[in-house]
Amino acid sequence: VGKYRERNEWFGRGGEPLIRMGVDLGLRMMGEQFVSGANIRLALANSREREAQGFCYSYDMLGEAALTAPDAQRYLAAYETAIHAIGKAAARRGIYEGPGISLKLSALHPRYSRAQIERVLAELYPRLLGLVQLARDYDIGINIDAEESERLEMSLELLERLCFEPTLAGWNGIGFVIQAYQKRCPALVDYLVDLGRRSRHRLMIRL
């Protein structure tokens, strides 16, 4: 029994490095399915092969919500850089054939909450509009990303303002991300259909 136990322990210790390597490889392979690169330039480079096969990408920047005004400014600058990079890579393919970008509104303002609605609308909307206009200049799609459920109404207010913005009239690159598992998803879809009709925009919807 003692020798059998020792042999099993030896095999167990000997197999640990292989198990670790296997787990590490598996995690890396899974990660590459969702994270294309550590920055936008790497992500664009790593996506070229799939794009040539007909895949379309909407790029998100991973990160948390802004906690301070300097955080929000850094995220704003990062989004501007990303839109320039994606726009150049898109090479005027248009909002349906080329890549796009998703924006996390809570990254653009440190107080993105209903309690601060007046301040948020006054301070965040000009930043959001500037990014959307930049995307329009490159003709790449730009989606407002999903946030926590209590922020949905505020996101919709900002979306509606964009849809009726005169400088964006006739452009169909505005999009919105829906959390399909929420109970109010059907009502939200109806609202977005109605908004598209009222504003004469074909909205880009992503689940």
Residue ranges and their predicted role:
Residues V1-L207:
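Positively charged, amphipathic and often flexible ligand-engagement surfaces
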